[in-house]
A protein has these predicted regions:
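Core subunits and conserved enzymes of cellular information-processing
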Residues: 2-222
Length: 222
């Protein structure tokens, strides 16, 4: 009888350690994904052909208030985070915190590194090269961070909540959300261009490609 209890306790402890190890690996996966995503954003910023709607709006707002992107985006994320927390706290996880705190600062950091290594993209060819590299890296990082499944960015949590409240399809709500934020980005003078539309409406298939071919396999190993 005692041996059975000891075996059960051992199994429970082993299972607990396994879950903790898996969580740590998934957190690391989310962290690396956000790091890669931010690197991609820095190349898109250098291309000067627009940014994703949320970052574009934050860049415009931070410029108007003479603040760094990291500080401004953190404040905006915190406001959205409070909304998501009280609306559906199940969407919050360690990945939420990683994304909301780090992305703005990492874009600043990678932009400085990219500038020192490669200089300014002062021709259309260099702009296109930076845009393509940025999109590839950005979508891979976005796929990795989302596949880790340890919480969504505050901005990404808004559409599912509104969709549930209004009974509208998620895709419809997300498109409306991105269009509103694109309009805001334009009004505040954020980087606005072809990349803004591409990131908002056309990167889904590339993110799915990275998820199916690479990141889901990494997640399954975890």
């Amino acid at each position: 009888m005692n041996n059975e209890k000891e075996s059960a306790l051992t199994a429970m402890n082993t299972n607990g350690r396994s879950k903790l190890t898996a969580l740590l690996y998934k957190t690391l996966m989310s962290f690396v994904g956000v790091l890669v995503l931010s690197m991609g954003e820095s190349f898109m910023l250098a291309a000067n052909m627009g940014m994703d709607p949320f970052t574009s709006a934050n860049l415009g707002g931070s410029s108007l208030l003479h603040m760094g992107l990291g500080n401004f985006q953190l404040m905006v994320n915190f406001v959205i985070f409070i909304f998501v927390l009280f609306s559906d706290r199940h969407m919050i996880g360690i990945g939420t915190v990683i994304n909301m705190v780090l992305v703005g600062y990492e874009i600043q950091w990678f932009s400085a590194i990219r500038q020192s290594l490669f200089g300014t993209a002062n021709s259309l060819t260099l702009q296109i090269i930076n845009a393509v590299i940025g999109l590839i890296i950005f979508t891979y990082g976005a796929s990795m961070y989302m596949t880790a499944n340890v919480g969504v960015a505050p901005y990404d949590g808004v559409a599912p909540i509104i969709s549930r409240w209004t009974h509208l399809r998620y895709r419809v709500v997300r498109v409306i959300q991105d269009i509103i934020v694109m309009g805001l980005a334009y009004l505040v003078g954020g980087p606005f261009g072809i990349l803004t539309f591409i990131v908002a409406f056309c990167t889904g298939p590339l993110i799915e490609f990275w998820t199916d071919k690479v990141n889901q396999k990494i997640y399954n190993l975890i």
